[in-house]
Amino acid sequence: VPSINPVESMRLTSQYGYRSDPFQGRRKNHKGLDIAGPIGTPIYATADGVIGRAQWVSGYGKYVEVEHGNAIQTRYGHLSAMNVYSGQRVHKGDIIGFMGSTGRSTGSHLHYEVRIAGEPVNPTSFLEAATKTSNILIASKDADSKSVGGPAE
């Protein structure tokens, strides 16, 4: 299950769901989140998995797809460079590529998707869970208390 943020600095520029398409100017469903940052910003695998595809895909540009098991998949688009290959095993936190503006893009950003059984789902809940877990673990490490809700990493 995706449980960390795909980039260190999370500056969301486009949410999941319906929005005005920047190329067509009409309302269209956006199947992921757009996270802005400088070209070359490291992109991290948000969970352990196997690379399904690492290639150019129309619209997405340089694209990485990670299969996490249990029909969960994450997709990373518009990369400037890919750091993985199809069939490679990756671990949560591994650098899988670098932010860019390839494909159908208006500027440097990461397009991040989570899919379950092939259907896009809102990645926001996964990112919120990652942030809350991080905050709990940091507070637990700083305070003289026991960690609750999972192992401290």
Locations of the language-model features?
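Short, solvent-exposed mixed-charge patches
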Residues: P151-E153
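Catalytic cores of peptidoglycan-degrading enzymes
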Residues: I4-D144, G149
